[in-house]
Amino acid sequence: MKKERTKVFGRGANECRRCGRRRGLIRMYGLYLCRQCFREVASELGFKKYW
C-alpha cells in the first residue's frame, strides 16, 4: 500500500478552519476561512461591510 502524502505547498495545502473546504480561501489577516464561511462570520469578526 502507498503512503498518503499531505499537500505541502500550493492551493490545496490550506483548508477552511470551519468546513475544511480548499477553494475560495481567504488567508488575509490569518483568517483561513473559505468565502462562504467568511460571509457568515464576518460581522462577528468586526468587518463593517457585512453588518
Swiss-Prot record:
- Kindly indicate whether the keyword Ligase belongs to this entry: no
Name the coenzymes or cofactors required.
Answer: Zn(2+)
GO BP terms: cytoplasmic translation
Provide the alphabetized UniProt keywords: Metal-binding, Ribonucleoprotein, Ribosomal protein, RNA-binding, rRNA-binding, Zinc
Record: residues binding Zn(2+): 16, 19, 34, 37
Quote any Pfam family the record assigns: Ribosomal_S14
Instruction: Note the PROSITE patterns from the entry.
Output: RIBOSOMAL_S14 (PS00527)
InterPro entries per UniProt: Ribosomal_uS14, Ribosomal_uS14_arc, Ribosomal_uS14_CS, RIbosomal_uS14_euk_arc, Ribosomal_uS14_sf
Q: Which GO terms describe its molecular function?
A: rRNA binding; structural constituent of ribosome; zinc ion binding
GO (cellular component) term, any one:
cytosolic small ribosomal subunit
**Cofactor binding, note field:** Binds 1 zinc ion per subunit.
Coiled-coil stretches noted in the UniProt entry, renumbered to this chain: none
Q: Does the keyword Hydrolase apply?
A: no
Concerning its family, UniProt says: Belongs to the universal ribosomal protein uS14 family. Zinc-binding uS14 subfamily.
Q: Which PANTHER family match?
A: 40S RIBOSOMAL PROTEIN S29
Function of the molecule:
Binds 16S rRNA, required for the assembly of 30S particles.
What does the record note on quaternary structure? Answer: Part of the 30S ribosomal subunit.
- Name the UniProt record assigns to this protein: Small ribosomal subunit protein uS14
Q: What taxonomic classification does the UniProt entry list for its organism?
A: Archaea, Methanobacteriati, Methanobacteriota, Archaeoglobi, Archaeoglobales
- Could you tell me the gene encoding this protein? rps14
